[in-house]
Amino acid sequence: IDTLQTHKDSVSCKECGTSTKIDSYGNFLPDFKFRTVEEWDSWQDEFYAEYYKSCDSETILFSDENVCVNTVTSEHETKNVGSGKICMYKEKFVFEGEEKTIEFDLSQISDMSIYGRKTLVFTDGTGAHYEVKSEKLINVRKYLTIYNLKKEV
């Protein structure tokens, strides 16, 4: 989780070294643990659900550094909140900026989604819109997955 890298038709894990290739139909080679991206995705969802259940509310589930957080107005104007680190817990999403820390209670986030390949967007309980961006490619899907798991509880 969060350690995959791709190059052309190859997919590999930076952590354990597992690798495979994708054929012209979008399937993995037959000797791989998963046959399709959908199978791998289902496994990942199960992993996240078990991981979520196994952690307490003070455990950082995930974090990413060197992100930029902006607010987006109803006129689509972007205002920089700051740069820093984001952390996902079971009950909250935290931005640890260079100048300030902002905590968002997950139950007060009314909507969260992914924009593009590396931008997480969400709306808080006051109706303020935020976007979390990174210059490098980060796995923003993990944050959305935990948010959705929290909504199900």
List the model feature ranges, each with a label.
Residues D2-F32:
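Cys/His-rich short segments
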Residues T3, S83-K85, D111:
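Short, surface-exposed charged micro-motifs
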Residues H7, C87-Y89, I114-G116:
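Structural motif
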Residues T18, G84, E98-K100, T126-H129:
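Short acidic/polar mixed-charge low-complexity motifs
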Residues G26-K85, E152:
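Anionic N-terminal interaction surfaces
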Residues G84, Y89-E91, D105:
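Short beta-strand or tight-loop elements
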Residues F93-E96, V121-F122:
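Short hydrophobic/aromatic-rich beta-strand segments that constitute the beta-sheet cores
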Residues F104-V153:
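Acidic, Ser/Thr- and proline-rich intrinsically disordered linker/docking segments
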